């Protein structure tokens, strides 16, 4: 094989050709006999002179084209750079605080810790295009009630965001470059615990989920397995479980790793809300002088988790903000505080925490901690739905198809709702089991000539919803079984549920 350069196209890419007679090609190609990839000096000068002349002619053509454009639009317009760099574009946005409403819940944090954290977070935070898009969610409603960020269906994640992570004096300012903000930038393979579903970083601990397992949870299971194999007589050779929790907490609190602190807070909150584990720990502490009762141990663990989550929330860690807001909204710390929960959800939503975006939409929809605002609720639901949040897709589909929450009752909106329900059905789970039911109701009756009625497919959707735990679908299947497989094709239950009288429609418009 030899490499030859076309003589008639100076400056072009080399041609590679395979020849059978290699010796003849070396003699006729003009290359030196030392190597087929080395040109002689005269050939080099001739080649590069032709290349330079070709480049100069191309530059003249570009200059002539530029003169023609400048003559048509003006010299001043040509001097302006039409495509500024991304850094200049990002820096042109007004600076916003990560947590503007943090005064509501930051007062309970220790003064020395919160002051140092504020200085670090304010000094190291850089505005991003993703945070600009998320801030448009809060103030993104036009005069006609429509969203102003429909073009931002897929916003880019943060790439250069840095936040002070430590609780004391530290030089560690690294932050994981993803919207949820879990872990550190030195470990890009560390998975985040915000997977846009309530059970992943929520207080619903009845459902087993491997994505929520921390190191301490794994150690607890290993401890139980060791006790089982050692037997009751030899189990005293193991370190008590409460002692390991205390040691783990002491080590974590001394570290500067924000992810480890969040894992520890999540674990002790899980233990504090699990009555069975609390009884096991109380039995281990019976022989000690400072033994706990079940209530006192629960209060101790929950308060310890609360302090850690507040510190993490003060530095803008979205997973901690969401978990703390979920605890406030569910009354884990005593009284339900919807206002604090809303502030935490909205703060995490500004950092593109998708589950927090959905919870903020629920707050605006139901008036939890904030005045009811249907357009803002629809805006938040739209943003969460575009990020594949199943519950947001389900709610947005229902509202769009039935013309609720101030959405127009026209054909285009109905078809948008139909498409959202189809996407939600493909991602249906035990938490979002209503999407197949609503889609089945649509296929039972159809819609004009756009959605053809298909009772067989509707029954399959009812079966899917019933298998996921939807009671109304199970009732419809039971009625069909009793009637010999016949299902009425009249108005489905959802159509009767969402049907509005004239007085209700007027009241809804006044509310919006």
Curated annotation (Swiss-Prot):
Residues 101-122, 144-165 are annotated as: Disordered. It comes from the Eukaryota. Its main location: cytoplasm. It is a peripheral membrane protein. It is found in: Cytoplasm; Cytoplasmic granule membrane. Residues 101-113 have a biased composition (Acidic residues). GO terms for cellular component: cytoplasm; membrane. SUPFAM superfamilies: HCP-like. One of its GO terms (biological process) is cell wall organization. Induction: During sporulation and at high pH. Pfam families: Sel1 (PF08238). InterPro entries: Chitin_Synth_Reg, Sel1-like, TPR-like_helical_dom_sf. Sel1-like repeats lie at residues 318-353, 354-389, 390-429, 433-470. Keywords: Cell wall biogenesis/degradation, Cytoplasm, Membrane, Repeat, Sporulation. Required for the activation of chitin synthase III (CHS3) activity during the sporulation process. Belongs to the SKT5 family. PANTHER family: CHITIN SYNTHASE REGULATOR SKT5-RELATED (PTHR46430:SF1), PROTEIN SKT5-RELATED (PTHR46430). This is Protein SHC1. The gene is SHC1.
């Amino acid at each position: 094989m030899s490499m030859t350069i076309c003589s008639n196209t100076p400056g072009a890419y080399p041609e590679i050709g395979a020849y059978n007679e290699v010796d003849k090609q070396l003699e006729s190609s003009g290359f030196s006999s030392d190597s087929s990839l080395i040109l002689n000096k005269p050939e080099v000068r001739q080649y590069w002179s032709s290349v330079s002349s070709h480049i100069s002619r191309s530059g003249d053509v570009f200059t002539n084209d530029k003169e023609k454009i400048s003559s048509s639009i003006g010299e001043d317009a040509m001097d302006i750079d039409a495509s500024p760099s991304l850094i200049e574009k990002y820096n042109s946005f007004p600076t916003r605080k990560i947590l503007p409403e943090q005064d509501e819940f930051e007062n309970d944090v220790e003064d020395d810790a919160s002051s140092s954290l504020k200085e670090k977070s304010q000094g190291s935070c850089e505005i991003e295009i993703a945070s600009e898009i998320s801030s448009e969610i809060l103030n993104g409603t036009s005069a006609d009630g429509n969203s102003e960020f429909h073009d931002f269906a897929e916003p880019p994640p943060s790439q250069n965001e840095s936040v002070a992570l430590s609780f004391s004096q530290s030089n560690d300012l690294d932050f994981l470059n993803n919207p949820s903000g879990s872990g550190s930038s030195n470990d890009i393979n560390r998975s985040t615990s915000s997977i846009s579903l309530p059970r992943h970083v929520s207080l619903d601990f009845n459902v087993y989920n491997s994505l929520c397992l921390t190191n301490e949870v794994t150690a607890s299971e290993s401890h139980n397995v060791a006790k089982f194999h050692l037997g009751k007589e030899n189990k005293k050779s193991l370190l008590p479980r409460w002692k390991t929790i205390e040691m783990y907490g002491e080590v974590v609190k001394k570290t500067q790793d924000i992810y480890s602190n969040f894992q520890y807070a999540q674990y002790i909150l899980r233990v504090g809300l699990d009555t069975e584990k609390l009884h096991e720990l109380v039995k281990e502490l019976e022989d000690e002088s400072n033994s706990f009762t079940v209530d006192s141990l629960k209060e101790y663990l929950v308060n310890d988790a609360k302090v850690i989550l507040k510190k993490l929330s003060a530095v803008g860690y979205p997973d901690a903000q969401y978990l703390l807001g979920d605890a406030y909204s569910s009354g884990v710390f005593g009284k339900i505080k919807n206002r604090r929960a809303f502030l935490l959800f909205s703060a995490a939503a500004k950092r593109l925490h998708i589950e927090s975006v959905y919870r903020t939409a629920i707050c605006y929809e139901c008036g939890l901690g904030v005045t009811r605002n249907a357009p803002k609720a629809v805006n938040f639901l739209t943003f969460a739905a575009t990020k594949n949040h199943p519950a947001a897709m389900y709610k947005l589909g229902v509202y769009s198809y039935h013309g609720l929450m101030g959405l127009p009752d026209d054909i285009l909106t109905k078809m948008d709702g139909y498409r959202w329900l189809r996407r939600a059905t493909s991602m249906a789970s035990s938490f979002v089991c209503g999407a197949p039911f609503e889609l089945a109701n649509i296929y039972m009756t159809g819609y004009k000539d756009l959605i053809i009625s298909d009772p067989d497919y509707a029954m399959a959707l009812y079966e899917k919803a019933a298998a996921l735990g939807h009671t109304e679908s199970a009732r419809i299947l039971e009625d069909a079984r009793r009637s010999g497989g016949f299902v009425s094709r009249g108005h489905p239950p959802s159509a009767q549920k969402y049907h509005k009288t004239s007085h209700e429609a007027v009241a809804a418009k006044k509310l919006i």
